[in-house]
Amino acid sequence: MQKMTIKEAENVLKEIMNEEDDRFQLLMKDERKGVQKLVLKWYKQKELEQKEKENFFEMSKYENALREKGVTYIAGIDEVGRGPLAGPVVTAAVVLPEDFYIPGLNDSKKLSEAKRERFYDEIKVQAIAIGVGIVSPQVIDDINIYQATKQAMLDAVANLSCTPQHLLIDAMKLPTPIPQTSIIKGDAKSISISAASIIAKVTRDRMMKELGEKYPEYGFEQHMGYGTKQHLEAIEVHGVLDEHRKSFAPIKDMIQK
């Protein structure tokens, strides 16, 4: 039997699901370095897929425990943008179906922008309901960032198309009669909170990129409103905008000068 070309071997390996496949056994016996590299790559890919699968099911334990008690609509809630000097705080509430599965799902801060965007689209398709809450810098200055974050989370829940029976929240307690569980570092421990963190992060990043187009000298599309050297220098040169949080240092100090 004629040997496959390296390219053919690469394409065949994409189709092979397990080592028992006759084609895989054939490639295992192929001594060409190029083929052996592809086989090794296949093993590493399968190992990664298995780890992602295990991690996903570990992150589903809160949801599974609630479903065993008959709870169907579970909303994961997370926020993005508590620390920046500019822009809103954005929260998301996401209700996922029982058969939801996106391997590699994690805290949005640990994912590349490309992966966040891809997961964002997949979550939008698969989710039962998504609600977003956005609180402006002006309100943040009026009621403080902690209260503004709570308000944004309550808004996100109110904007859901269904009423959740239980809330899984990343390190917060909300003044609502809906039963809730607060989970420290929940965006890495719950698939619902992780999905919410991705929706919130992509939503806010897109808003900050729009601000970057409106005020190109500030570079919002690069630092997303955080207090980087570039951002602070831009404020010194061009001044404080309406989009800046006047109650946050060093903006507060700059205004008082």
From Swiss-Prot:
Record InterPro entries: RNase_HII, RNase_HII/HIII, RNase_HII/HIII_dom, RNaseH-like_sf, RNaseH_sf
EC number: 3.1.26.4
Subcellular location: Cytoplasm
Ligand binding (a divalent metal cation): D78, E79, D170
Cofactor section: Mn(2+); Mg(2+)
Domain of life assignment: Bacteria
Catalytic activity: Endonucleolytic cleavage to 5'-phosphomonoester
UniProt keyword Cell membrane present: no
DNA-binding keyword on record: no
Record keywords, A-Z: Cytoplasm, Endonuclease, Hydrolase, Manganese, Metal-binding, Nuclease
GO molecular function, one term: RNA-DNA hybrid ribonuclease activity
Alphabetical list of Pfam families matching this protein: RNase_HII
Residues annotated as transmembrane: none
Domain RNase H type-2: from-to ranges: 72-257
Cellular compartments per GO CC: cytoplasm; ribonuclease H2 complex
Cofactor-binding details, from the entry: Manganese or magnesium. Binds 1 divalent metal ion per monomer in the absence of substrate. May bind a second metal ion after substrate binding.
GO BP: any one term: DNA replication, removal of RNA primer
Family: Belongs to the RNase HII family.
PANTHER family referenced in this protein's UniProt entry, alphabetically: RIBONUCLEASE H2 SUBUNIT A (PTHR10954), RIBONUCLEASE HII (PTHR10954:SF18)
NCBIfam families in UniProt: PRK00015.1-1, PRK00015.1-3
UniProt function note: Endonuclease that specifically degrades the RNA of RNA-DNA hybrids.
Protein name: Ribonuclease HII
UniProt source species: Bacillus cereus (strain G9842)
